[in-house]
Swiss-Prot record:
Catalytic activity: L-lysyl-[protein] + 3 S-adenosyl-L-methionine = N(6),N(6),N(6)-trimethyl-L-lysyl-[protein] + 3 S-adenosyl-L-homocysteine + 3 H(+)
SUPFAM superfamilies in alphabetical order: S-adenosyl-L-methionine-dependent methyltransferases
Protein name: Ribosomal protein L11 methyltransferase
Documented EC number(s): 2.1.1.-
Gene Ontology cellular-component annotations: cytoplasm
Gene name linked to the record: prmA
Keyword set includes Transferase: yes
Molecular function as annotated in GO: protein-lysine N-methyltransferase activity
Biological role stated in the UniProt entry: Methylates ribosomal protein L11.
Amino acid sequence: MKLLAVKVECSHELEDGLSFFMQDELDAQGIESRKRSDFVAEGQKHDSSLVELDDIENLPKDLELTAYFNYENADKKELVKKITDKIAEMKGYGLNTGEVSISTKEVADEDWNTAWQKYYHVIDFSRHLAIVPEWEDYHPAFSDQKLIRLDPGLAFGTGGHTTTQLVLLAMERALVKPMSVLDIGTGSGILAIAASKLGASHVLGTDISDEAVTAAKENIALNDVNNINVRKANLLKDIDDKYDLIVANILADILLELIPDLDSHLNKEGKVIFSGIDYLQLPKVEKALAENNFEIKMKMQEGRWIGLLIARKPD
C-alpha cells in the first residue's frame, strides 16, 4: 500500500494538538514526530558535543510532524488546507506556531514501518510502569514495575505524548482496587494495557478507527493480559454497560461532546480521567462538567496540557 506523507514544520507548542487533529479528525494512519530538543537532550545525556547534531539527517529547526495517509483515499490539497486552517486556529488560542511549512510526498508503506522505529525507545515512566518497544530488551528497574510492550505500527499512542503521560499518572492513583475500565479512543491500546497491568478487573477499549482497533489488538497480544476487549465505537454510542473508571485522552472539543453521556455509563462510585485539554480550553470543560453534576478531584498540568481526575458531585 502506498502512503501520502504530509510533513509539517512548526513550533513544538503545536505537537500534541496537531497530532491529535491529524489522527482523530483527518484519519492519519500514523504520526512521526522529530523535535530538535530531543536530539540536543540526547547529546547532552551522553556528553556529546552539539557539533555531532550536524551529522543528523535533516535535523528540524524545532518540530517536524509527519502524518501518513492512505494514498488512494487522500486529497492532498484538502489535507494541506485543513492542516493550515487548524494551525491558524491554534495560533488564535495563543500558541506560538513558529515558522510553518507544509510539504507532501508519496512513500511506500514498508519504508515508514521500519524507518520510524529509530526514534522510539523505552520510556521508564515510573516505579510502576515502563513503556517498552517490542523489539527492545529491557529489564524492570523495580521489582514491581510493569512493562507495557508496544509496536505502535500505524496507530497513535506511543506513551511519549504529555497527554498520555498525564492519564497514566492519574490511573496510577485511581486504580487502587480491581475496577472495570472503559478507554475511549484507545489508539495503540496503551492506556487499556496500562489499566490491566495496574490491576483493572476488565477493560474495554474503543476507537472510531479500524486501523487503531487492529493495532490495539496486536499490542494487547504482546502483553501478558487476558482481560481486555477492543472494538470499534464512536465515543459512548453503542456502549451499554457501566464502568468504574472511564478514560478519554481526546481533544477538548470532543470531550465536551462526551460529558453529557458520562453519568449513564458510570457506576455509583465511578471516576473519569480526561486528558488532551489545552489550558485555554479548560474553562469550557470545567463549566460543562459542573453543569452535568461532576467535580474535579485532581488537576494535573504539564506545559499547556491539562489532565483531570473527575467524580460526581456528592449528593
